[in-house]
Amino acid sequence: MKIDLNADLGEGCASDAELLTLVSSANIACGFHAGDAQIMQACVREAIKNGVAIGAHPSFPDRENFGRSAMQLPPETVYAQTLYQIGALATIARAQGGVMRHVKPHGMLYNQAAKEAQLADAIARAVYACDPALILVGLAGSELIRAGKQYGLTTREEVFADRGYQADGSLVPRSQSGALIENEEQALAQTLEMVQHGRVKSITGEWATVAAQTVCLHGDGEHALAFARRLRSAFAEKGIVVAA
């Protein structure tokens, strides 16, 4: 069995360089919620050095709230903003001899695109316009995954090690209790259950079906590095290979 392990990087966290030795894919902030040209360049350089797949992490234009504010923007605006961000990272990667492999929206853009078909379509269309060979990463079973498939893109369904789930397979909003799993043992058990058995127990006790093709590790967590190492060890014990 193989699983991709991804982390959101270039967001000002001190652990980026070390996380790149533990993950197989990096989602690099493109300036709209965090990061800048120099940080993008540095992240790309480190990703290439570690053999980690490079991906763009586009966001709503919301540096003030780290891309976590809900926005109602016209689909054409989102299309243009997404194209702008992934185009910038693709060029930075190419200039350093690398290749951008995937795109994963950030924060509220990701969450809204999971449920809003028009928004999902705008993102998938931008990814396709930039490069039809790019992989589109989205929440397992979401509108974004459906939109990607409609454009003929390769999609990668994502699950979260440290997030609580609702009965329909969606994430518990960060504003609600149970959104974040801070108990390491619980997060580890949830991740193995999703990867090995394709299901997750919701905060209300029901089992939800999920397709786990990539697992997100949040690099901004207090114990991100220690948990990443534990997860790698657990995968190795179960014979699960970490690879993009």
Curated annotation (Swiss-Prot):
Family in the record: Belongs to the LamB/PxpA family.
Enzyme class: hydrolase
NCBIfam families registered for this protein in UniProt: PRK05406.1-1 (NF003812), PRK05406.1-3 (NF003814), PRK05406.1-4 (NF003815), PRK05406.1-5 (NF003816)
Record carries keyword ATP-binding: yes
SUPFAM superfamilies: Glycoside hydrolase/deacetylase
Subunit details: Forms a complex composed of PxpA, PxpB and PxpC.
Protein name, as recorded: 5-oxoprolinase subunit A
Gene label: pxpA
Keywords: ATP-binding, Hydrolase, Nucleotide-binding
CDD domains the UniProt entry points to: LamB_YcsF_YbgL_like (cd10800)
Record GO terms (molecular function): 5-oxoprolinase (ATP-hydrolyzing) activity; ATP binding
BP GO annotations: carbohydrate metabolic process
UniProt lineage: Bacteria, Pseudomonadati, Pseudomonadota, Gammaproteobacteria, Enterobacterales
Phenotype upon gene inactivation: Deletion of the gene slows growth on minimal medium with ammonium as nitrogen source.
InterPro entries: Glyco_hydro/deAcase_b/a-brl (IPR011330), LamB/YcsF/PxpA-like (IPR005501)
Known function: Catalyzes the cleavage of 5-oxoproline to form L-glutamate coupled to the hydrolysis of ATP to ADP and inorganic phosphate.
The protein's Enzyme Commission number: 3.5.2.9
HAMAP family, sorted: PxpA
Keyword field contains Signal: no
Catalytic reaction equation(s): 5-oxo-L-proline + ATP + 2 H2O = L-glutamate + ADP + phosphate + H(+)
